[in-house]
């Protein structure tokens, strides 16, 4: 199988979508998981104020609200968690996102003290973290907090990973990539925008430049700069459209380079890495 055929088969992106149908598909998927696992009563999600967590949060709250209405069980709850490292540059966007999704519960856990303590402990042991490695510490601390909250509320951690992110592996292993359920997978970036538009989301939340904003020395570094390819090019590629050869090569290189992130820990029986 050619590399592009394999990528398209793995990422499951449709050439065209009906935004309303895809919204219902994600909501019903989330509800079905709760109905199957009746001991689960909550969804937990970290909210950044960007497109992906805004969309995921809205879908999660819709699913929880419908579960309460259908079952009469008020124990079903959605926890939207703000996880700043110190002060977040686009805090106003996060507040706008929270107001849009109207979560049952809003929590704020500032991760700065925990991350700084970890960095200091490593330095004391002779391990000096680079700015990039410290950025991954932030992502993993955020996920640790979300799992702690989920543990106390019969919950699962919802992920924001979509196919345009999955194909490039643009997430931290066991950080924002370490979730329980991903309702956006199968959608690319522009399709996510279409869902938010259908849901009546404020435009500025899905038109802003995507950024992981993990590095102290490169605040708000755009994803597209870090990747060396635009989301429009990634979206076109995943929809089977023509893209410049250099963009296709970069996407395919990211896919191969980050394949380990899309698997559990490698065992002697795995051969994808060979």
From Swiss-Prot:
Instruction: Give the InterPro entries listed for this entry.
Output: NAD/GMP_synthase, NAD_synthase, NH(3)-dep_NAD(+)_synth, Rossmann-like_a/b/a_fold
Catalytic activity from the UniProt record: deamido-NAD(+) + NH4(+) + ATP = AMP + diphosphate + NAD(+) + H(+)
What's its job? Catalyzes the ATP-dependent amidation of deamido-NAD to form NAD. Uses ammonia as a nitrogen source.
Top-rank lineage group of the source organism: Bacteria
One cellular component term (GO) for this entry is: cytoplasm
CDD domains named among the record's database cross-references: NAD_synthase
Recorded name of the encoding gene: nadE
Similarity remark? Belongs to the NAD synthetase family.
Q: Which organism is it from?
A: Listeria monocytogenes serovar 1/2a (strain ATCC BAA-679 / EGD-e)
Q: How does it assemble?
A: Homodimer.
UniProt protein name:
NH(3)-dependent NAD(+) synthetase
**Annotated binding of Mg(2+), by residue:** 52, 165
Residues engaged in binding ATP: 46-53, 160, 189, 211
Q: Which HAMAP family match?
A: NadE_ammonia_dep
Presence of the UniProt keyword rRNA processing in the record = no
**Keywords per UniProt:** ATP-binding, Ligase, Magnesium, Metal-binding, NAD, Nucleotide-binding
Q: Which biological process terms from the Gene Ontology are attached to this UniProt entry?
A: NAD biosynthetic process
- What's a Gene Ontology MF term here? NAD+ synthase activity
Q: Where does deamido-NAD(+) bind?
A: 140, 173, 180, 260-261
